[in-house]
Curated annotation (Swiss-Prot):
NCBIfam families the UniProt entry points to: PRK14683.1
Disulfide bridge partners, by residue number: none
Name of the molecule in the record: UPF0102 protein ERGA_CDS_00540
Signal sequence range: none
Any single Pfam family the record assigns to this protein: UPF0102
Length: 127
């Protein structure tokens, strides 16, 4: 018999999945081409990968019933960045595209918040 925490985890996963599907529909309305949904590789996971006008967008979606903003940690950002590099290494046709990392918050109480260029790859300066 499943435990209560298993139901809770299932509810959170379902809510997250629904949030991702809503963002995909939103992106398609804005004429983005969805490349991957829930992309997984040995280095991590990316919720949505899309492109439009030679720009590749890696998207993290946070969904909540009531919270307006759910923080994304530096560790999560780093994991998404590594996964994005992995994706590009195996999909060379996107190598010349500009890259952007977006964050979408979706809450039933406050609606949709989009943060384009939510973070960037740290630039290394050699002296």
């Amino acid at each position: 018999m499943p435990y209560k925490k298993d139901y809770k985890r299932l509810a959170y996963n379902t809510l997250g999945y629904l949030g991702e599907v809503l963002i995909i529909l939103f992106l398609k309305c804005k004429l983005y081409h969805i490349i991957k949904h829930r992309y997984r590789c040995p280095l991590g996971e990316i919720d949505i990968i899309a492109h439009k006008n030679k720009q590749l967008v890696f998207i993290e979606v946070k969904t909540s019933l009531f919270n307006k903003n759910i923080p994304i940690t530096y560790k999560q950002q780093k994991s998404i960045l590594k996964s994005a590099k992995y994706f590009i290494a195996f999909h060379r046709k996107f190598a010349n595209y500009s890259i952007r990392f977006d964050l979408y918050f979706f809450s039933l109480s406050t609606g949709l918040t989009h943060i384009p260029n939510a973070w960037q790859e740290p630039q290394v300066v050699y002296k």
